[in-house]
């Protein structure tokens, strides 16, 4: 599939934008080649500047659970647009969307809207520290919570090693306030809680990991997380990716979690920039203007994003069968991928929860970040480009989830599997 216009755009973009992209994974650094410059989306498909059509499994990295350009979402945004772009003032739409969030997450009393998942997690951690008066946070390897300084850290050797920066520009002294543990290692978590629990403000975690590829929590790991409450540690469920995707109440509903705070994004904005952090009243009342924890934003709660999010959540709430449909379609795709890869004699593990799926090119099981890193990235490049050249747009990294939407059909799954047979 030829993309000369995209190639020209990419070369021009690199003269004006770092790496030619506004987010690193879009540059295809992990897979090589030229990213298609997309100009249109409809349903489960996107089109590039060269006129090529692709079946989309990126779906803007998760927000588009209804598919591209859903007519009801577009209509709500157009209606709102006619009244103005943004006011920097309270609006009825943010009240309506907050009420939807509370219906989806019954433990939530108060919701604060922001503009990105990074803002949501950063603000939730500041709130946790302000509420508890404690300095340390715990995160897990392979869990991504945005690009705030305190979260761009990785583990050293041993469960109690203080975090060290994984990005230039993050002071080591600041990174040391983050303790980084292995995901799905309940005993390691229990050890840290036993020795340092009273210093820890919060544990932030992805209930289902999406940014190391899909990783699924074990029951004992979830149990160990909830044991942290006995030490006065707040649990922050980062549902920026899983919120409203795995169920209307996200992974919290699906897995029966009991967090103190939840962070939301992606689907919450219906395709426009919106995110939120939310939780129990006694914690959220520490946020300004009610309390001493400061957080603000010029475009927070802006009408266009609130309108898109509200229309999306209304459709999800009114059509609970969407989640059963996505589970069935996801199961078909999972089974088909396993069948094709087995036919080809390739090492593989397919991890899936609902409409999130990852193919790892390694023998399973893949339950930790260390397991995920065993994947054969060269084989993934063949997989990715073989699909892309046949009109299937899979995420350009082996450590990202692929997403289904309600716009995908059974014939799209069959088209994907046939393309994979030819590609490999």
Swiss-Prot record:
Signal peptide: none annotated. One of its GO terms (molecular function) is pyridoxal phosphate binding. Its EC number is 5.4.3.8. Its main location: cytoplasm. CDD domains: OAT_like. One of its GO terms (cellular component) is cytoplasm. The modification N6-(pyridoxal phosphate)lysine is found at residue 266. Its cofactor is pyridoxal 5'-phosphate. It is an enzyme of class 5 (isomerase). This is Glutamate-1-semialdehyde 2,1-aminomutase.
């Amino acid at each position: 599939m030829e993309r000369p216009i995209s190639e020209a755009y990419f070369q021009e973009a690199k003269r004006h934008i770092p790496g030619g992209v506004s987010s690193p994974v879009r540059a295809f650094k992990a897979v090589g080649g030229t990213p298609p410059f997309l100009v249109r989306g409809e349903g489960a498909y996107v089109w590039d500047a060269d006129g090529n059509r692709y079946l989309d499994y990126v779906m803007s990295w998760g927000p588009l659970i209804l598919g591209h350009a859903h007519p009801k979402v577009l209509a709500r945004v157009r209606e709102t647009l006619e009244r103005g772009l943004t006011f920097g003032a309270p609006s009825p739409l943010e009240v309506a969307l907050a009420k939807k969030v509370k219906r989806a997450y019954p433990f939530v009393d108060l919701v604060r809207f922001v503009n990105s998942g990074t803002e949501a997690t950063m603000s939730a951690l500041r709130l946790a520290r302000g509420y508890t008066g404690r300095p340390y946070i715990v995160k897990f390897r392979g869990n991504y919570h945005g690009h705030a300084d305190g979260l761009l850290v990785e583990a050293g050797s041993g469960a109690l090693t203080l975090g060290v920066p994984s990005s230039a520009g993050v002071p080591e002294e600041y990174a040391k306030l983050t303790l980084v543990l292995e995901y799905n290692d309940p005993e390691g978590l229990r050890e840290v809680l036993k020795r340092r629990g009273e210093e820890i403000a919060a544990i932030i975690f992805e209930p289902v990991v999406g940014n190391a590829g899909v990783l699924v929590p074990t029951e004992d790991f979830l149990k160990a997380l909830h044991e942290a409450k006995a030490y006065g540690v707040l649990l922050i469920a980062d549902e920026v990716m899983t919120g409203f995707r795995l169920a209307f109440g996200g992974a919290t509903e699906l897995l029966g979690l009991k967090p103190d705070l939840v962070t939301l994004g992606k689907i919450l904005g219906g395709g426009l920039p919106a995110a939120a952090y939310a939780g129990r009243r006694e914690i959220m009342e520490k946020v300004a203007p009610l309390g001493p924890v400061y957080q603000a934003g010029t475009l927070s709660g802006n009408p266009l994003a609130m309108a898109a999010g509200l229309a999306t959540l209304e459709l999800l709430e009114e059509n609970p069968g969407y989640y059963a449909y996505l589970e069935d379609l996801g199961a078909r795709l999972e089974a088909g991928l396993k069948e094709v890869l087995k036919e080809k004699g390739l090492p593989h593990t397919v991890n899936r929860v609902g409409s999130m799926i990852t193919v790892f090119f390694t023998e399973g099981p893949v339950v930790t970040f260390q397991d995920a890193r065993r994947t054969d990235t060269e084989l993934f490049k063949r997989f990715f480009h073989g699909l892309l050249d046949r009109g299937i747009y899979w995420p350009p990294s082996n450590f990202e989830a692929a997403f289904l939407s309600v716009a995908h059909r059974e014939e799209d799954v069959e088209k994907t599997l046939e393309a994979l047979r030819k590609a490999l």
